[in-house]
């Protein structure tokens, strides 16, 4: 979800939206490799994205988001919120696999199609399948 959250935040900021990126970790993109995370955070900060670390969403109403600090349970109230975009709870898209399984003898499934996860895992999946063929 780190990749998705950073990408959506950047897209919205480029389109002129005011963006506040809340993350449960210490920084946005915490699990992304350091060289990418730092570069991407620089882009986001340069576009005016406000990054709010160590929080989780616990409620919302018409124009307010209610966050809770994951490290001390402090509550934060974020006003003037038009839209909340969640980058969590991903589900694999196996539609293509299902179509191919009836047409091909062997179908290898990798990446997010196999299970929602990071890009490095998808590359490793591809390497393993490629080496086994």
Regions found by a protein language model. Name each.
Residues 14-99, 103:
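A Rossmann-like FAD-binding core segment of flavoenzymes
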């Amino acid at each position: 979800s780190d990749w998705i959250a950073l990408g959506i935040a950047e897209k919205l900021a480029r389109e002129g939206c005011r963006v506040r990126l809340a993350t449960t970790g210490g920084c946005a993109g915490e699990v992304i490799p350091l060289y990418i995370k730092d570069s991407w955070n620089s882009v986001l900060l340069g576009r005016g994205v406000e990054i709010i670390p160590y929080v989780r969403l616990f409620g919302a109403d018409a124009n307010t988001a209610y966050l809770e600090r994951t490290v001390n349970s402090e509550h934060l109230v974020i006003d003037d919120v038009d839209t909340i975009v969640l980058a969590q709870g991903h589900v694999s898209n196996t539609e293509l696999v299902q179509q191919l399984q009836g047409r091909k003898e062997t179908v290898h499934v990798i990446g997010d199609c196999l299970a929602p996860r990071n890009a490095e895992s998808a590359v490793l999946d591809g390497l393993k399948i490629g080496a086994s063929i």
